[in-house]
């Protein structure tokens, strides 16, 4: 018997895509034939032949190795202006039919599980009749709800989300809590477990916060500060795990941090790089693990940096990508801190880690048993 599972979340940025990817991979690892669909998407990528697909559908196609067919894996895109266009002429946008036809391609003869990934919070899409709850109902799927780590606010958000699914007659079969600080895991498991037990909903997993899932690529940082690449563009996909400013280099423990972003004013860069080398030597390191340099307060820092032999030797020897930004160091730090890091096709290590986290912290056997033993 085929099972349709709809992965919803109480909010954006809770980790829905990460958990969905982990569940798909974990089911596959158990020998099941798994199909994936993002019925309603908002952020899309352009493909060949003037086609578009949700960016998450592209991620899953590459990670799970299937041919991306937008009309099947990403049937509806609600981009800018879509909702206004819909209400100007609803008959021209048969969204429901597109979703139903997409799901029909996942026949029981070919797929044991169909995993449908939701969009945003449960109410997203309501303006065109495609809330997460409505889509789950029309596709005949049952819901697993992903919630943020917490107690009071998390329970409030769950209650609001569950009300919408109940209104549509859709059953929520379990809850997975994501991004929980390690020292809060048992407390959250205890209290959320009590509440969910009273509601008759299983707690299927508590996934700890994993810092590596939040590491941005240097290219994402460049975009956030509207920077320009000065040197070594081929290394712009270095991952960034920590940040140090030039003024704090001498107090920074380089031994406990890898993939460091150095943020420094262009004029002070030669002096700061010498300090980096000195600190590394004092701390017993053969070389500092600098993954990128952001030169601040700079509109055309290339001549200034290129004219300094020490800077160029450091950049070339350690193959460090360098960008510049007009922002000052404080302004750049604010922009970087505001980055919302998403799993994508350029971060394959995150896809692998997502699978590990789900396999380790989600009771997948319980999830399977629920779907196999309880009638749809």
Label each region the model flagged.
Residues 2-376:
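Flexible phosphate-sensing "switch/lid" loops adjacent to ATP/NTP-binding sites
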């Amino acid at each position: 018997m085929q099972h349709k599972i709809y992965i919803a979340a109480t909010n954006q940025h809770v980790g829905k895509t990460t958990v969905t990817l982990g569940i798909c991979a974990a089911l596959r690892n158990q020998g099941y034939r798994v199909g994936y669909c993002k019925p309603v998407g908002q952020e899309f990528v352009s493909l060949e032949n003037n086609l578009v697909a949700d960016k998450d559908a592209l991620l899953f196609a590459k990670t799970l190795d299937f041919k991306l067919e937008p009309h099947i894996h990403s049937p509806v895109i609600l981009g800018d202006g879509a909702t206004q266009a819909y209400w100007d002429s609803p008959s021209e946008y048969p969204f429901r039919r597109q979703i139903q036809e997409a799901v029909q391609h996942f026949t029981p003869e070919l797929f044991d599980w169909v995993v449908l990934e939701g969009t945003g919070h449960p109410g997203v899409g309501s303006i065109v009749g495609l809330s997460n709850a409505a889509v789950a109902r029309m596709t005949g799927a049952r819901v697993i709800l992903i919630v943020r780590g917490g107690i009071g606010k998390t329970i409030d958000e769950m209650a609001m989300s569950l009300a919408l699914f109940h209104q549509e007659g859709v059953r929520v079969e379990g809850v997975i809590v994501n991004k929980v600080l390690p020292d809060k895991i048992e407390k959250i498991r205890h209290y959320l477990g009590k509440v969910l037990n009273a509601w008759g909903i299983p707690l299927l997993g508590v996934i700890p916060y994993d810092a590596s899932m939040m590491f941005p690529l240097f290219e994402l940082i460049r975009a956030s500060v509207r920077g320009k690449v000065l040197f070594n563009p081929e290394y712009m996909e270095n991952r960034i795990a920590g940040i140090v400013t030039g003024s704090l280099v001498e107090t920074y423990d380089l031994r406990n941090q890898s993939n460091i972003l150095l943020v420094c004013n262009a004029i002070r860069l030669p002096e700061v790089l010498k300090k980096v080398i000195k600190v590394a030597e004092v701390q017993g390191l053969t070389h500092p693990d600098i993954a990128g340099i952001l030169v601040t307060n700079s509109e055309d820092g290339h001549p200034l940096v290129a004219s300094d032999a020490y800077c160029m030797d450091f950049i070339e020897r350690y193959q460090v990508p360098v960008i510049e930004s007009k922002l000052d160091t404080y302004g750049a730090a604010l922009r970087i801190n505001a980055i919302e890091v998403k799993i994508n096709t350029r971060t394959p290590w995150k896809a692998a880690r997502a699978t590990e986290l789900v396999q380790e912290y989600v009771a997948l056997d319980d999830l399977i048993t629920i779907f196999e033993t309880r009638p749809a």
